[in-house]
Amino acid sequence: MVQSTPETLGSLSKLMETLAMALVDLPEQVTVNEIIGENTTVIELKVAKEDIGKIIGKQGRTAMALRTILNGASTKLGKRTVLEIIE
């Protein structure tokens, strides 16, 4: 298992930023904020109002896929990570 450090957790937020920028029409308005707790890290993803539907997807499928990717990567680091999509 890889030891989780702020650098490796930062790579998770960079991963979410890269994926979100590929999905939206206004990639310059994608912002990612990371809140590191003792056991859990929260990654807040904010996109333009016009792009929120593209990030959530039909019936939340795209958001679920993003969370699955994030959970898989964070499990390898031995950390629990939550993705919050902010309007």
Question: Whereabouts are the PLM-identified features?
Answer:
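An amphipathic, aromatic/His-enriched active-site/gating alpha helix that lines ligand/cofactor pockets
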Residues: 62
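RNA-contacting regions in translation and RNA-metabolism proteins
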Residues: 1-52, 69-87
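Residue-level signature of catalytic and energy-coupling elements of molecular machines
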Residues: 30, 57, 66
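Short glycine-rich loop/turn motifs that provide flexible caps or phosphate-binding loops at active sites
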Residues: 52, 56-59
